[in-house]
Amino acid sequence: MSLWGKSKKNMQGLVGLFIFYLALGYQINSMRKVSILGLMSIFSLSILFHLLVIIGIVPSHIVWGGRATNADELMQLEIVSISLNTLFLVFILILNGNIKVRIKPLLAKILLWLMSILFILNTIGNLLAKSSIEKIIFTPVTLLSSVFCLYLALRFLYSKG
């Protein structure tokens, strides 16, 4: 059975990560918290996923629209993806106060808008992918990421709720 045939185990992993974040003290009591927690989870899981692609556990044909032509190109794309997801995760941790770095509100808002646009474009790319797995699994993930970033861009800097 393939990795994707074990959707129940994948779902259990997502639930486990969600419980892990709750155990760390994140309480979901507002849309802001849902957005922050959702983005932290998505970026963390995305980093893990792309590491699994690099080491060969996840088949490479289900990423990058199935268009990576060779191992070198795939590695470059995966490194870019891991780097961007790490930067996004650090940025969200800064916004949430987990990392004590001051960031100007205007810069934060611009970055959130850019992330929203990037995830919308990525959603379109996923819809055009050759792989049905990429369409079915990653289209909702990138769409949700864009919604969370858009919400934070519109509301996060004006209130804490």
What is each residue range found by the language model?
Residues 145-161:
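Membrane-water interface at the C-terminal end of transmembrane alpha helices
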Residues 6-10:
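Polybasic, lysine-rich low-complexity intrinsically disordered segments
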Residues 64-72, 105, 131-142:
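Non-cytosolic membrane-interface motifs at loop->transmembrane helix junctions
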Residues 35-49, 142-147:
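Alpha-helical transmembrane segments of integral membrane proteins, especially early/N-terminal helices
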Residues 123-138, 157:
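Membrane-helix boundary connector in multi-pass membrane proteins
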Residues 108-125:
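Hydrophobic alpha-helical membrane segments
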Residues 45, 52-54, 71-97, 113-117:
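Core segments of alpha-helical transmembrane spans in multipass integral membrane proteins
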Residues 29-32, 36, 54-79, 101:
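Interfacial loop at the N-terminal end of multi-pass membrane proteins
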